């Protein structure tokens, strides 16, 4: 985990173990606009009912400067790895433990069918560059609520307030190394999966919808700058399947730097030690002090081994 502070934000790497209130945001536009959050797809582990929720949070956390393995994500809620990470059940508990703010779709606050209202909610968060954990039915499965969790990372739309059948949603499904793209009218179905589900493997429930938007890091100091992490491989050693842990490589990017100003980049090797203020007095693992120069006037990129 990394934080770089203006002499800061956080950059969190924990690889050793391998909100916003929904108020409506009007932004009518005459031509479609595309907003993409640069989050690369990652492969989920399939064992023990699947690690899709853990993989969702892992990807969103990377965008905000935090790396945790899928194992660590699940261990936050269940140390024996038997309980799933689920939206509307325990996803926010994990995000809070990682010092990330989040908000969930209020599925109790809207009449059924909810899909169009839900899709408008997702659009509003994507406009604010908040990745969204979305839930889906999977053809051939039978859970009445949802079977799978994915991460919405972008939208093409002419407005960012309400549903439009021609909108396009970008999302990571955790099985493909490529970002998926679907038109809004093809995204939803009921449990039988006989309409859109006849063509597509994943569909958002039409009637009752569940989602969780990740808003960003907890930063009481209000001094942290945007840090993101990119991993060198889209998979990680599946220790649940008996694969031995290995060292991962990561690139850390910091944006919003001002030439001539001093900064400190903090690394935390344990998510439980990440601070939300007074970073210089926190239990960080390493610190890198630097002055922004013309070499990287607005951003810093560096690499770290992650064991």
Residue map of PLM features:
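Beta-strand signatures of extracellular beta-sandwich domains
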Residues: 264-266
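Conserved active-site-adjacent core of cysteine acyl-enzyme catalytic domains
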Residues: 30-39, 71-221
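Active-site nucleophile-adjacent alpha helix/oxyanion-hole segment immediately C-terminal to the catalytic cysteine
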Residues: 35-80
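C-terminal beta-strand-rich structural cap/linker in extracellular carbohydrate-active enzymes
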Residues: 286-307
